[in-house]
Amino acid sequence: MKLNDIINIIEDIAPVNLKEGFDNVGLMVGDREKNITKILLALDCTEEVIKEAKEMGAELILTHHPLLFRKPSTITTDTLLGRKIISLIKNDINLYSAHTNWDSVKGGLNDTLVEILGFNKGIIMDKSPVDSEAGIGRVVELTKEMTVLEIINLIKSSLGVKNLRYAGDLNEVIKKIAIVNGSGQDFFGDAKKLGADLIITGDTTYHFVSDYKEMGLNILDIGHFNSEWPVLIKVSEKVKERLDSDVEFIVSKEAKDPFEFI
C-alpha cells in the first residue's frame, strides 16, 4: 500500500485543518510513493522507537507528537533531532504525525478518553473555527455523582495508571468534569467558567494548580503519557481497519513514559 494512500486515510480520520495554529502535523520525513507493509504506532519518535521500527522492518512510524515541531536550523548528528532525522532517512523509514487535529476531531482522542472513562458524551470546551463538532477539551455532566477519590480509582482502573497527582478534596462530591488529554492547564479558566468541579489532564505546573485549587477547582494530573498513549492505541483502530489486508499495524513496545516514580 502506498504511503500516500495511508496518509489519505489518516487525514480523512483526522483532517489537517483541525490542528491548532501552533502545531505541525503531517508527513515529517518520507516519500509518498513508498510502498508500506508495516506501520509502527508510537506516541513519540524516540531513538528507541526508530530502532524498533528498523529491527521489525516497519517502513512507517505513525506518532501523535510531531518530531519536527519547530524548524531546525541544521540537521546534523550533533543534535538529538538531527540524529533522529538522519537515522530515519538512512533506514528508509517514513514518519507521519497527527497531533492536535487527532485530539480535536469528533471521535478523536478527547472524545475517546471520555468514552474509556465511561462518561456520557460531553460538550466541547474550545470549538474549532472550521468544524463545530471538533475542538479541544470536553466537559461532561455525571449521571451519578462521584467523589474525587472514586474518580481517581476509575482513572487508575480504566487507563492502567499506577500513580497520579491531585489537588483538592478527595471526599468532595463531583457533578461536572472537564477533560483535556495532554497539556491542559491552559484550559483551567474555561473549565471553571463552564462550571466544572474537577479537571482531568496532564502536565500541570505549581502556580496554575495552586491558584485554581484556591478557586475551588479539583485537579487530577494523570501525566501526559497516561492521558494519551492508551487513548491513542484505541483511537488508532480506525486507521488499522481501513488498511489493506497485507499491511501490518503494530503498537510499539518502546513507547514509554519518560517519568518514573521512586
UniProtKB/Swiss-Prot annotation:
SUPFAM superfamilies: NIF3 (NGG1p interacting factor 3)-like. A divalent metal cation 1 binds at residues 64, 103, 228. GO terms for cellular component: cytoplasm. A divalent metal cation 2 binds at residues 65, 224, 228. Keywords: Metal-binding. Belongs to the GTP cyclohydrolase I type 2/NIF3 family. This is GTP cyclohydrolase 1 type 2 homolog. The lineage of its organism: Bacteria, Bacillati, Bacillota, Clostridia, Eubacteriales.
